[in-house]
């Protein structure tokens, strides 16, 4: 029998103090466990597929610092490279050869990227790419999809999924109508809705931006022909297609979703994996479009810590590890085993459920499904997910503390980890 009692005294004390120091006690809303209930755990250290909290409890981790830890936490090759880089300094604020190296790796891997610009976060990348889309097309309106998250910039906080969905907010106070008046929304996987928006706004739409696989409204995959249809529509209307691959980039394939599905956008945003666990973001695409970015062109974008040598170092080493033969085959195998196992256990224990995976990304909804879009996701049993999350946590499995977040595996997860996780899930689901 798995121990279901965990000591969390120190976590509770630290989090209680944090609430007097930081809004909600956290630096990002989903970490506060608002949608799953209970107290968040406070981490002490991580290694491989595991995390340890300040009370000494160990967990199998399927959050992976929200995506970057695809090789496992604190991989010795990454840590070793970072140690050497630290000896040279933590920040230059000037060009470094490391930027060239990582840029070449990204350009070689991602089909759409001919030039790339490094920034500090996925939010920054999406903000910059929106400005670039508008400048290149000389149009203002942009189509995004309900439940797709592109960071917390004002213009994207419209049916944005992720933390906004977790907190039950339709958008955010403080966002002026003028900031979102040019942001059009459509249901994910609904080509007809996109066609209608193009017809209603002829010659006004700069482009379409989306998560090619949605990971911020749970895990939702594109229907057959959806991405191809968007590519055709944007070509037809002289608009740009942007894939936000902050989550899917280098995770569902080395070349991201665009490699996986064979659809090449005009621009791409990246983050997470390309920083190896350090703060990073990037955007890139066709040379003629990227050449508009300052100082090569008139579209301004800058950052004090952009191209940080430590982030570049961790990114380079992470991509080198992912280039090793068999890496993605391994990720596919263990993630399929996990996703299939969780779904089977849920159904066998009498719960309505659906889910799936692509490579090292997976999800489980407590609804009979299928889940094609944000509205479908919102109809899932989030209260049951909260009980499931708490039960798994108490038995040593750390899942994302929200129904509206995808799960992640890594090269560090073993078959034994997966078997143990499925066994624990059976125990939990049999009790709720």
Curated annotation (Swiss-Prot):
CDD domains: OAT_like (cd00610)
One example of a Gene Ontology biological process annotation: chlorophyll biosynthetic process
Main location: cytoplasm
Chain positions found as N6-(pyridoxal phosphate)lysine: 272
Tagged with keyword Signal: no
Enzyme class label: isomerase
Keywords tagged on the record: Chlorophyll biosynthesis, Cytoplasm, Isomerase, Porphyrin biosynthesis, Pyridoxal phosphate
Protein localization: Cytoplasm
HAMAP family: HemL_aminotrans_3 (MF_00375)
UniProt family annotation: Belongs to the class-III pyridoxal-phosphate-dependent aminotransferase family. HemL subfamily.
UniProt-recorded name of the protein: Glutamate-1-semialdehyde 2,1-aminomutase
Species per Swiss-Prot/TrEMBL record: Nostoc sp. (strain PCC 7120 / SAG 25.82 / UTEX 2576)
Gene coding for it: hemL
